């Protein structure tokens, strides 16, 4: 599916009706938000991009209740705020359950997320599972914890989603996450694959949704800073993601600096695949391709 140019463009034109809906106040959690024109423009851009992703990938199809993963980072806080705002406007007909999985990392501030989620009035669940000890035991010295830690977290979130009667797990991955994953697979895995905006889990009973797929990380960072979310650092365990992802992030930043707009172009390319111009015979029947007699 080809991504609409408008879905990624800051100057997207929207209908007068939708503009009126976005201008009609905001969820109470935005009560202390900046009143500047620039922030209002940023907020509406992110709301439009989330709505576009919901529509493009049919994320609302069959959905009744979502488990929203909240780690305490800028991305998941922003995702939850935008979803709550859309729901408040009557544009998101699903129930939201925010969930944080405390994985037993050292110095994790246990009060921050419960206090914040309680203050904004969202149904939430905080669960403690000491996966950190498992990761420390299994991962060789000097290696990063992130991959195994992520897999253990995902498995627990699936379980919690089922226990909460949710039909989808909603995560805060954004445009840069998707592009970095694509190039990691491209350079290191020898395959064309990325992080899909919508995925059915292996068991076939839960969807994994990424409504921030079109949103730029820089926009999310500005939004989170303006909203003054109580950010919890992601390096409490002392382990950071490997050099591969950092290298991809640096490469993409350099390309965007030298050729502004290339990240959006790359993202559109992921939705405009021409199988006959690639080399995978499983995607295109090259064997039967021959000139007319």
Swiss-Prot record:
UniProt cofactor note: Binds 1 [4Fe-4S] cluster per subunit. The cluster is chelated by three Cys residues, the fourth Fe has a free coordination site that may bind a sulfur atom transferred from the persulfide of IscS.
One Pfam family hit: ATP_bind_3
SUPFAM superfamilies documented for this protein: Adenine nucleotide alpha hydrolases-like
What broad class describes the main subcellular location of this protein? cytoplasm
Q: Which UniProt keywords apply?
A: 4Fe-4S, ATP-binding, Cytoplasm, Iron, Iron-sulfur, Magnesium, Metal-binding, Nucleotide-binding, RNA-binding, Transferase, tRNA processing, tRNA-binding
Q: One GO MF term, please? A: 4 iron, 4 sulfur cluster binding
Q: Where is this motif: PP-loop motif?
A: 71-76
Enzyme Commission designation: 2.8.1.-
State where the protein is found.
Cytoplasm
Q: What cofactors does the UniProt entry give for this protein?
A: Mg(2+); [4Fe-4S] cluster
> Which family does the entry's similarity section mention?
Belongs to the TtcA family.
What quaternary structure, including any partners, is listed in this protein's UniProt entry?
Answer: Homodimer.
Anything else known? The thiolation reaction likely consists of two steps: a first activation step by ATP to form an adenylated intermediate of the target base of tRNA, and a second nucleophilic substitution step of the sulfur (S) atom supplied by the hydrosulfide attached to the Fe-S cluster.
Function per UniProt: Catalyzes the ATP-dependent 2-thiolation of cytidine in position 32 of tRNA, to form 2-thiocytidine (s(2)C32). The sulfur atoms are provided by the cysteine/cysteine desulfurase (IscS) system.
The name of this protein is tRNA-cytidine(32) 2-sulfurtransferase
Species of provenance: Sinorhizobium medicae (strain WSM419) (Ensifer medicae)
């Amino acid at each position: 599916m080809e991504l609409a140019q408008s879905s990624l463009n800051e100057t997207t034109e929207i209908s007068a009706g939708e503009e009126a809906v976005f201008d009609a106040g905001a969820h109470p959690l935005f009560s202390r938000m900046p009143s500047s024109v620039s922030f209002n423009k940023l907020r509406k851009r992110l709301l439009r991009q989330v709505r576009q992703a919901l529509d493009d990938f049919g994320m609302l199809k069959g959905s009744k209740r979502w488990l929203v993963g909240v780690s305490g980072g800028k991305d998941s806080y922003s995702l939850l705020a935008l979803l709550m705002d859309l729901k408040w406007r009557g544009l998101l007909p699903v129930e939201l359950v925010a969930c944080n999985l405390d994985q037993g990392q050292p110095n994790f501030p246990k009060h921050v997320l419960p206090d914040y989620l309680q203050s904004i009035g969202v149904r939430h669940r905080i669960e403690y599972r000491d996966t950190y000890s498992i990761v420390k035991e299994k991962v060789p010295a000097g290696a990063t914890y992130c991959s195994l830690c992520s897999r253990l977290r995902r498995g627990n979130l699936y379980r919690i989603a089922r226990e909460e009667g949710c039909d989808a797990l909603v995560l805060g991955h954004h445009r840069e996450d998707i592009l970095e994953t694509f190039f990691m697979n491209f350079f290191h895995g020898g395959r064309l694959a990325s992080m899909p905006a919508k995925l059915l889990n292996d068991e076939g009973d839960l969807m994994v949704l990424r409504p921030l797929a079109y949103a730029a990380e820089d926009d999310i960072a500005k939004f989170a800073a303006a909203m003054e979310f109580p950010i919890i650092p992601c390096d409490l365990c002392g382990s950071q993601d490997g050099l591969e992802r950092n290298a991809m992030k640096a490469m993409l930043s350099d390309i965007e600096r030298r050729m502004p707009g290339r990240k959006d172009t790359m993202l559109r390319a992921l939705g405009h695949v021409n199988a006959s111009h690639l080399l995978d015979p499983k995607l295109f029947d090259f064997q039967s391709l021959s000139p007319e007699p």
